[in-house]
């Protein structure tokens, strides 16, 4: 008797969670990894700097290197760490590349960005740890473990896409690379601004001992 309500809740959750198939595709990328072959030479972690600029197809065609990008929008450095731990359960790549620019961000920006990284992870101790480190004050752990708690009111926003992809969403990337029509190769590099003068805080201001 208990199983019937549980099944109904599960079906409802599958229907109500966002599918990210045609809009905000970044939200589908983390989950896609689990359907890929687990034999990559290189694993790449980070945000749009990696998943819009590094092409696993080009790496394979030109150098014979198999790679996968576990990228997501505004991916934080600790999220990259737990994604790495999660990935190492499935394979052992020879090289791991991490976008260290994320180290400049100390706090999560919003629930929306958190969701695009965390919702797609399979439930594990690494997902729970990443949730704990990422949550804003308004968020709670239960809504990540049971997404229905977060998306139960989304019924009024449902579209045909939610029904079509209730069980399986189409791939939006190629090995984690998200093709964006608006992204173009750099043709000119603007002149960099002059660096600030850090003389006052450098070692040159120290009074060094002199030989008497």
What is each of the regions a protein language model found here?
Residues 1-17:
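Hydrophobic membrane-insertion alpha-helices, especially the h-region
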Residues 113-206:
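Secreted/periplasmic serine-hydrolase-like ester/acetyl group-modifying domain
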Residues 34-58:
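Short extracytoplasmic
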Residues 207-211:
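A short, hydrophobic C-terminal helix/tail in secreted or cell-surface proteins
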Residues 49-130:
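Membrane-embedded segments
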Residues 18-24, 45-46, 72-76:
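Short, flexible loop segments at the rims of nucleotide/cofactor-binding pockets, characterized by
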Residues 19-35:
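Alpha-helical transmembrane signal-anchor/signal-peptide segments
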Residues 61, 95, 200-202, 212:
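Mature, folded catalytic cores of secreted/periplasmic enzymes
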């Amino acid at each position: 008797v208990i199983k019937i309500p549980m099944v109904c809740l599960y079906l409802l959750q599958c229907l109500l969670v966002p599918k990210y198939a045609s809009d905000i595709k970044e939200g589908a990328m983390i989950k896609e990894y689990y359907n890929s072959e687990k034999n990559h030479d290189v694993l790449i972690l980070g945000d749009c700097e990696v998943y819009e600029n590094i092409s696993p197809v080009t790496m394979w065609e030109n150098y014979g290197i198999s790679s996968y990008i576990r990228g997501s929008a505004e991916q934080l450095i600790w999220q990259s760490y737990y994604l790495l731990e999660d990935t190492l359960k499935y394979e052992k790549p020879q090289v791991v590349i991490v976008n260290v620019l994320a180290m400049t961000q100390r706090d999560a920006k919003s629930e929306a960005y958190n969701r695009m990284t965390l919702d797609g992870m399979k439930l594990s101790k690494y997902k729970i740890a990443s949730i704990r480190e990422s949550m804003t004050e308004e968020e709670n752990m239960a809504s990540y473990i049971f997404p229905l708690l977060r998306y139960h009111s989304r019924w009024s926003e449902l579209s045909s896409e939610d029904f079509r992809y209730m069980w399986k969403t189409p791939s939006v990337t190629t090995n984690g690379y998200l093709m964006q029509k608006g992204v173009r190769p750099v043709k000119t590099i603007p002149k960099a601004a002059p660096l600030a003068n850090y003389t006052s805080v450098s070692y040159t201001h120290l009074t060094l001992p002199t030989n008497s």
